[in-house]
């Protein structure tokens, strides 16, 4: 493979790369668009993929109403759109070698379907508008038809697996303006860094505030404002710090509860490591060791060094104390199904999870003569069957289209539901809240899975 590195530093990666661009910080997006323009100009882009999986019709209709909405007009329209992003301009603005830029563009164009890319914090987080770097890099992935291909670039969610929890209440209907303020409607994460400022502005009052493995006084901007608010009982009534370490914020908490690290608690994990999916099971090793030696452990903190809490057990116990008679509708979410009237145990919880939400695991465990929970306890992880190549090209069976209506653009719509990540028939797992629940898009007369966007395609132009 040819390695291309864009980094103002002579990093370890840059030192091993075939081509290194030491672009002026903040100009990386310009450089990438210059490469994109060369691909289109020279005809070395994957026009077939672009026509099939990009919403180019919307792009032409909305931005170029003077042109007929036919694919033959897409290339010329893109060249006009990116007219200023010439190799000469990129060399001047980015401080790079023009000939090397042309060479790199040719190299990328010669490897359609095999463009693997990655961006991290430097250019994206270090500059205002740095998020455009990731978007422009993804444009190269699309122009080369390298989305989800062997040797290409996967969406990270395709290689993670999140099982559906066995018990899950309906989402609450109240919007939290303290965490999701209306001033930032497009924020990807909650605006927790602004919480003390909202409290000082009189927007609200926190009766009870949990900080879970979170040290805002040290981590967030303007730590002294956090210190001020954490000490002010008129702003926060009770502060509970759930933390594995003593820290600056815990100093100002009413209660400090030691929380376990990965080897002291139960949890599931999944990361994008290869062209497949897997799920891992974290468990308290001291408790597991004692149980293997014949001991009975009722609560994990009895086995953990320093009586460290197992936080899922903590919240189950806390919920039962908050709602002892079940009148608030809280206790029922943490009540045993096998033994009604008693709290849910983690053995029961994870048994339900592994038996019903991880495809292939029950069969694998049965072949060994053990339960799915015992399988995960012994082996620690499970690799799900199948690969994740070109997820969007998967056929969608008719059963998944039930209740959906095909619109004028070929999208099978099922409004009002969270988007599933894959075939509903195949799995009881999903990447939550992606898409709008539309199960498929029609491509050449066939229902395909597509992408979790309103058009079910890669959106060059979003309405």
Description of each model-found segment:
Residues 1-4, 30-33, 138-255, 260-268, ...:
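Extended redox/cofactor-interaction regions of prokaryotic respiratory oxidoreductases
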Residues 1, 20-27, 65-69, 73, ...:
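Alpha-helix capping and helix-loop boundary segments enriched in small/acidic/polar residues
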């Amino acid at each position: 493979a040819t390695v291309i590195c864009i980094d103002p530093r002579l990093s370890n990666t840059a030192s091993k790369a075939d081509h290194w661009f030491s672009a002026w910080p903040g100009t990386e997006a310009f450089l990438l668009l210059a490469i994109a323009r060369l691909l289109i100009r020279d005809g070395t882009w994957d026009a077939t993929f672009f026509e099939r999986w990009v919403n180019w019709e919307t792009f032409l209709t909305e931005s170029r109403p003077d042109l007929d909405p036919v694919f033959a007009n897409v290339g010329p329209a893109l060249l006009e759109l990116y007219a200023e992003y010439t190799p000469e301009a990129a060399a001047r603005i980015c401080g790079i070698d023009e000939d090397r830029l042309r060479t790199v563009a040719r190299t990328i164009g010669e490897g359609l379907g095999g463009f693997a890319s990655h961006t991290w914090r430097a250019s994206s987080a270090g500059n205002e508008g740095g998020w455009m770097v990731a978007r422009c890099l993804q444009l190269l992935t699309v122009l080369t038809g390298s989305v989800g291909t062997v040797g290409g670039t996967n969406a990270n969610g395709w290689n993670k697996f999140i099982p559906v929890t066995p018990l899950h209440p309906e989402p609450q209907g109240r919007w939290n303006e303290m965490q999701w303020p209306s001033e930032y409607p497009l924020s990807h994460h909650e605006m927790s860094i602004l919480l003390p400022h909202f409290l000082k502005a009189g927007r609200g009052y926190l009766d009870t505030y949990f900080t879970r493995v979170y040290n805002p006084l040290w981590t967030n901007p303007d730590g002294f404002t956090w210190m001020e608010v954490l000490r002010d009982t008129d702003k926060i009534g009770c502060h509970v710090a759930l933390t594995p370490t003593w820290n600056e914020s815990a100093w100002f908490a009413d209660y400090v509860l030691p929380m376990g690290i990965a080897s002291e608690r139960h949890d599931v994990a999944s990361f994008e490591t290869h062209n497949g999916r897997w799920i891992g099971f974290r468990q308290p090793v001291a408790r597991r060791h004692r149980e293997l030696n014949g001991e009975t452990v009722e609560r994990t903190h009895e086995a953990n060094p320093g009586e460290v809490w197992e936080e899922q057990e903590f919240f189950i116990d806390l919920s039962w104390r908050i709602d002892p008679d079940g009148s608030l509708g809280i206790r029922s979410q943490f009540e045993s199904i096998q033994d009604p009237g008693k709290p849910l145990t983690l053995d029961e919880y994870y048994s339900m999870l592994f038996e019903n939400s991880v495809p292939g695991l029950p069969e694998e465990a049965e072949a060994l003569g053990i339960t799915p929970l015992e399988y995960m306890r012994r082996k620690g992880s499970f690799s799900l069957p199948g690969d994740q190549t070109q997820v969007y090209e998967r056929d969608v069976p008719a059963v998944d289209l039930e209740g959906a209506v095909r619109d004028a653009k070929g999208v099978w719509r099922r409004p009002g539901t969270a988007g599933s990540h894959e075939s509903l028939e195949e799995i009881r797992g999903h990447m939550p809240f992606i898409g709008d629940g539309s199960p498929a898009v029609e491509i050449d007369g066939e229902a395909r899975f597509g992408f979790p966007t309103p058009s079910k395609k890669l959106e060059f132009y979003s309405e």
